[in-house]
């Protein structure tokens, strides 16, 4: 399982906030973070192995909310990408009922919520999933009475069972989210996005496109590079760059970055750094946008090295090209397949948000 877990974590190690800051060595900070993470994930995977068996690891990530409760015998999984909620337990249906209610009524505030512990997430008077899920009568799930009635309906009418490889029996329910759940989540953050866009001079649709690609507007998002929140900011790289730009010392805390206001401000600040510092010499705005998107994922240094090992020569070559050429090169010649796909995804998402405005 340990080998499986490490393989599962590898795609996240290059999440969006690999800072392009030249000349600053973050190896020591990264080593400390990953050592602590190794201990945490080792303990966590041991619990899941013991209770659920092999090949049953589910863990919170950028676009997946996963919360274990009841000493890890019950879990809730919200796939913000697929738009589906699965809640399952190895205990009695009362525990399933409790988990359904708490999941449907969880708040949007991820600060202080330990996704690797086994306690319940508090019920909120302003549920994050409000407007994204409806009950069996088509009504919004706005309070505990509606959520409890829906949970009872699901257990009485939609309960399913499956058997794990370790012989344990699991009871579960599956709840689809509404068709436009992504748009509903995006709208929750539009005021903050517009404020940051105006403050830093960054296109609103670009912020939306990056946020959808990074987290699918999941406020609980986390990667195993310790990228945090809606815009997946890594504290010791992009976060440190942003704090330096703002005249602050150190780096943002996890709690700081789980605040949507802080997270969006930090992510958009980092885009400003890419636009006005690391990639400042690129003259065509469309070419610069393509470079910024790719750099948000892989770092400005990696982007420029696609064109030339010398920074000034790389910028000169970019400026001799049409934007379409820059796009083609970054989506075909970048050594990172993740970075190649990232530009494709963000550009597509940005176009979608431009149309909807």
Swiss-Prot record:
<dbReference type="GO" id="GO:0016998">
    <property type="term" value="P:cell wall macromolecule catabolic process"/>
</dbReference>
<keyword id="KW-0732">Signal</keyword>
<dbReference type="InterPro" id="IPR023664">
    <property type="entry name" value="Murein_transglycosylaseC"/>
</dbReference>
<keyword id="KW-0961">Cell wall biogenesis/degradation</keyword>
<dbReference type="GO" id="GO:0071555">
    <property type="term" value="P:cell wall organization"/>
</dbReference>
<dbReference type="GO" id="GO:0009279">
    <property type="term" value="C:cell outer membrane"/>
</dbReference>
<dbReference type="GO" id="GO:0000270">
    <property type="term" value="P:peptidoglycan metabolic process"/>
</dbReference>
<comment type="function">
    <text>Murein-degrading enzyme. May play a role in recycling of muropeptides during cell elongation and/or cell division.</text>
</comment>
<comment type="similarity">
    <text>Belongs to the transglycosylase Slt family.</text>
</comment>
<dbReference type="InterPro" id="IPR000189">
    <property type="entry name" value="Transglyc_AS"/>
</dbReference>
<keyword id="KW-0998">Cell outer membrane</keyword>
<dbReference type="InterPro" id="IPR023346">
    <property type="entry name" value="Lysozyme-like_dom_sf"/>
</dbReference>
<keyword id="KW-0456">Lyase</keyword>
<feature type="lipid moiety-binding region" description="N-palmitoyl cysteine">
    <location>
        <position position="16"/>
    </location>
</feature>
<dbReference type="Pfam" id="PF01464">
    <property type="entry name" value="SLT"/>
</dbReference>
<protein>
    <recommendedName>
        <fullName>Membrane-bound lytic murein transglycosylase C</fullName>
        <ecNumber>4.2.2.n1</ecNumber>
    </recommendedName>
</protein>
<dbReference type="GO" id="GO:0008933">
    <property type="term" value="F:peptidoglycan lytic transglycosylase activity"/>
</dbReference>
<dbReference type="GO" id="GO:0016798">
    <property type="term" value="F:hydrolase activity, acting on glycosyl bonds"/>
</dbReference>
<keyword id="KW-0449">Lipoprotein</keyword>
<keyword id="KW-0564">Palmitate</keyword>
<feature type="lipid moiety-binding region" description="S-diacylglycerol cysteine">
    <location>
        <position position="16"/>
    </location>
</feature>
<feature type="signal peptide">
    <location>
        <begin position="1"/>
        <end position="15"/>
    </location>
</feature>
<keyword id="KW-0472">Membrane</keyword>
<dbReference type="InterPro" id="IPR008258">
    <property type="entry name" value="Transglycosylase_SLT_dom_1"/>
</dbReference>
<dbReference type="Pfam" id="PF11873">
    <property type="entry name" value="Mltc_N"/>
</dbReference>
<dbReference type="InterPro" id="IPR024570">
    <property type="entry name" value="Murein_transglycosylaseC_N"/>
</dbReference>
